[in-house]
């Protein structure tokens, strides 16, 4: 077994919000986790499901050798539904961490950081915020969800230092009514860097509003097959060269905003 593949152990699993599960995994792969925004490629035990499931890493604890993932389940025919049935002690065949993550080394204590997340794109932003907290920078975090019953990680973000957290829900059941773009309109400062992950429509809106920001980092969500750049199933167009295919699994999932043609 290579260092990028391991049978990790399920430590715990719970339904964190409606149809969104939180799984804690333990294994030596955690030693390889350094950049927030990378993902794991999980094999589903059901033999009929050949493709692995890419799931972003929400956080990790290197001393405990554990990491946490959050994922939305589908119906009973889906691989994520199968994953949600795993109990503590179960083994999961995992490759990772894969892809390029969010750069944090350049952030300083004087930076004003804007983090924008939507739905199931929120989890990888939590480890990012944890690492940014260590720099002493000021963070404004905008999160959008469909409704209160699918809201995740609010307490975790709130417990970080130097954080201003705002939440919007489409139906107005929690926080500001409307999509996360409405929260963007409330920002009255110039961000030094922006990190975002969420649905394509949200990412497009962020990229349009902040297209002049040099340090704009966008994490793309995409269906994947191989997870290592061999199959070209998860491509995005290069903004500077439309004939060039950017592979989300290998070149991303995190890209500079100026790279993407959204």
From Swiss-Prot:
Pfam families (alphabetical): DHODB_Fe-S_bind, NAD_binding_1
Classification via InterPro entries: Cyt_c3_hydrogenase_gsu, Dihydroorotate_DH_ele_sf, Dihydroorotate_DH_Fe-S-bd, Dihydroorotate_DHASE_ETsu, FAD-bd_FR_type, FNR_nucleotide-bd, OxRdtase_FAD/NAD-bd, PyrK_electron_transfer
Co-factor remark: Binds 1 [2Fe-2S] cluster per subunit. Binds 1 FAD per subunit.
Disulphide-bridged cysteine pairs: none
Coiled coil: none
Pathway, per record: Pyrimidine metabolism; UMP biosynthesis via de novo pathway; orotate from (S)-dihydroorotate (NAD(+) route): step 1/1
Keyword annotations of the record: 2Fe-2S, Electron transport, FAD, Flavoprotein, Iron, Iron-sulfur, Metal-binding, Pyrimidine biosynthesis, Transport
SUPFAM superfamilies, per the entry: Ferredoxin reductase-like, C-terminal NADP-linked domain (SSF52343), Riboflavin synthase domain-like (SSF63380)
Protein origin, superkingdom: Bacteria
Amino-acid positions noted as binding FAD in the UniProt annotation, renumbered to this chain: 53-56, 70-72, 79-80
Annotated binding of [2Fe-2S] cluster, by residue: 226, 231, 234, 249
Subunit structure: Heterotetramer of 2 PyrK and 2 PyrD type B subunits.
Protein name: Dihydroorotate dehydrogenase B (NAD(+)), electron transfer subunit
Organism: Lactococcus lactis subsp. cremoris (strain SK11)
